[in-house]
C-alpha cells in the first residue's frame, strides 16, 4: 500500500506546473534571444536606469522612428518596469521593423529570466510568443508570391 501511495505522490509532482527560477550569468545579467522575421536579437538585461544600447549605439540613434522605440518599450510597460532595467543587445538580419520586434521578444524573455513572476503579464500581452509570420516565397510562373503576370484575353 505504501509503494502505491508513493507512486501517486510521484505522479502528482510530475503534473505540477514548472517552477521558474532566476537565470543569471556571472555578471548578474539575464540573457535571452528574440526572433522576428529574419532578425535575431541577443539581449542582456540588468537592473539600472532604463538605458537601451543597440549594436553599441543608443536606441534613439539606431531606431530613429518613434514607433519602433515604442515597440521596444512595450514589455517594460506591460510589466510596469519602465526605467528599471538597462538593456544591451546586438541585432542582426532583416529590416528595422523586424529588428525592433526581435528586440521586443528578447527583452520579454530576458525579463522573465530575471523576474519569473512577470511571466504572467508578459504572456497575457503576447510578448513571449514567437511571431512565426515570415515572407511568403515567390513562385515560378508568377510575378510575386501571389500576383500573376498581366493576362490578356485577346
Curated annotation (Swiss-Prot):
PROSITE patterns: RIBOSOMAL_S9 (PS00360). GO terms for molecular function: RNA binding; structural constituent of ribosome. It holds the Pfam family Ribosomal_S9. Disulfide bonds: none annotated. GO terms for cellular component: cytosolic small ribosomal subunit. Keywords: Ribonucleoprotein, Ribosomal protein. One of its GO terms (biological process) is translation. Belongs to the universal ribosomal protein uS9 family. This is Small ribosomal subunit protein uS9. It comes from Azorhizobium caulinodans (strain ATCC 43989 / DSM 5975 / JCM 20966 / LMG 6465 / NBRC 14845 / NCIMB 13405 / ORS 571). The gene is rpsI.
Amino acid at each position: 500500500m505504501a509503494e502505491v501511495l508513493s507512486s501517486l505522490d510521484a505522479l502528482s509532482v510530475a503534473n505540477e506546473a514548472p517552477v521558474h527560477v532566476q537565470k543569471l550569468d556571472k555578471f548578474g545579467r539575464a540573457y535571452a534571444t528574440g526572433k522576428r522575421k529574419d532578425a535575431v536579437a541577443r539581449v542582456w538585461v540588468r537592473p539600472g536606469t532604463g538605458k537601451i544600447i543597440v549594436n553599441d549605439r543608443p536606441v534613439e540613434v539606431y531606431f530613429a522612428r518613434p514607433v519602433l522605440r515604442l515597440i521596444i518599450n512595450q514589455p517594460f510597460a506591460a510589466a510596469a518596469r519602465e526605467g528599471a532595467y538597462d538593456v544591451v543587445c546586438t541585432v542582426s538580419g532583416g529590416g528595422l521593423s523586424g529588428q525592433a520586434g526581435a528586440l521586443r521578444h528578447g527583452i520579454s524573455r530576458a525579463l522573465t529570466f530575471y523576474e519569473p513572476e512577470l511571466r504572467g503579464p508578459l504572456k497575457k500581452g503576447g510578448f513571449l510568443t514567437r511571431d512565426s509570420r515570415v515572407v511568403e516565397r515567390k513562385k515560378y510562373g508568377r510575378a510575386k508570391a501571389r500576383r500573376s503576370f498581366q493576362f490578356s484575353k485577346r
